[in-house]
Amino acid sequence: MYNPFDEAYHGLCEEILEIGNRRDDRTHTGTISKFGHQLRFDLTKGFPLLTTKKVSFKLVATELLWFIKGDTNIQYLLKYNNNIWNEWAFENYVQSDDYHGPDMTDFGHRSQQDPEFNEQYKEEMKKFKERILNDDAFAKKYGNLGNVYGKQWRDWEDKNGNHYDQLKSVIQQIKTNPNSRRHIVSAWNPTEIDSMALPPCHTMFQFYVQEGKLNCQLYQRSADIFLGVPFNIASYALLTHLVAKECGLEVGEFIHTFGDAHIYSNHMDAIHTQLSRDSYLPPQLKINTDKSIFDINYEDLELINYESHPAIKAPIAV
């Protein structure tokens, strides 16, 4: 079946595999990479959740709502069984003086290569998650990821200590001055990079109103094509829907612009498996509430007619 969203994503994967540069990287995993690429998704044609592997809409939506709420603590995510950010918080904990368990140095690589260590790692992670959920003081200290996306979107702080809600301001601008070229939200705050568990990969987005439709363009400096990008596509498509509804507009395009678009060397088999699959028709999104974007919960969102191939597991590079 024809699915323009799968087709665009598959095309990017194939191009990276064909012409990409082999590079070392921060995680020492190794990548094949292309610098500079753009995908365009017409959101009137459906919701761009890939169908050639199962992508969890719940994980996409709860992470985005976490950003929108300005939250930076994984406790909110874990309440929805969303484990996307666990490794970065866990890393901070096991490097602290409060951790007294087995040595977790380089747990990302060791858990993939040593089955015995992997069992220890899973047990320590399980205990960590339980403490985050059940011990608010512990969660406050070790569940916080620093000044990551939610903080920058909702509470940007300048050098004078003034605070600025970028997302709320942009929504107000769209309502009052839709033709402005300043509908921009940035997560890249150079003065706070060192205080973030992970510097923002999706760094800046801009809205553009045209004929009653809201378009959104994202610039992503670093893009994990197999694990991250399917989530990023769906996340910013959902953001476009939510902001459009808030502003009384229809959705238009989501434009995804990449800097370093890369496939990790240990994702090659997974990518080839996905590329061998045929697509299903794209699903539809329904927002079952008139709440403000800042009050919406996951339960207010509904994904209709999502049919996909099974998920494909691959290791995360920390």
From Swiss-Prot:
Enzyme class comes to transferase
One GO cellular component term, please give it: cytosol
A Pfam short name: Thymidylat_synt
Where is this protein localized, as stated in its record?
Answer: Cytoplasm
The record's GO molecular-function terms, alphabetically, read:
thymidylate synthase activity
Q: What is its EC number?
A: 2.1.1.45
Residues binding dUMP are: R26, R181, R182, R221, S222, A223, D224, N232, H262, I263, Y264
Tell me what reaction this enzyme catalyses: dUMP + (6R)-5,10-methylene-5,6,7,8-tetrahydrofolate = 7,8-dihydrofolate + dTMP
CDD domains the record matches = TS_Pyrimidine_HMase (cd00351)
For this UniProt record, the keywords arranged alphabetically read as follows: Cytoplasm, Methyltransferase, Nucleotide biosynthesis, Plasmid, Transferase
Tell me the InterPro entries matching this sequence: Thymidate_synth/dCMP_Mease, Thymidate_synth/dCMP_Mease_dom, Thymidate_synth/dCMP_Mease_sf, Thymidylate_synthase, Thymidylate_synthase_AS
Report the superkingdom from the record. Answer: Bacteria
The residues the record assigns to binding (6R)-5,10-methylene-5,6,7,8-tetrahydrofolate are D224, A317
GO term, biological process aspect, one: dTMP biosynthetic process
Task: Give the positions the UniProt entry annotates as the active site.
Answer: C201
Q: Cite the SUPFAM superfamilies for this sequence.
A: Thymidylate synthase/dCMP hydroxymethylase
Coarse class of the protein's main subcellular location: cytoplasm
Its UniProt pathway annotation is: Pyrimidine metabolism; dTTP biosynthesis
Family membership, please give it: Belongs to the thymidylate synthase family. Bacterial-type ThyA subfamily.
- Relate the assembly described in the record: Homodimer.
* Record's function text: Catalyzes the reductive methylation of 2'-deoxyuridine-5'-monophosphate (dUMP) to 2'-deoxythymidine-5'-monophosphate (dTMP) while utilizing 5,10-methylenetetrahydrofolate (mTHF) as the methyl donor and reductant in the reaction, yielding dihydrofolate (DHF) as a by-product. This enzymatic reaction provides an intracellular de novo source of dTMP, an essential precursor for DNA biosynthesis.
Q: What is this protein called?
A: Thymidylate synthase
Ranked from the top, the taxonomy reads:
Bacteria, Bacillati, Bacillota, Bacilli, Bacillales
Identify the gene encoding this protein: thyA
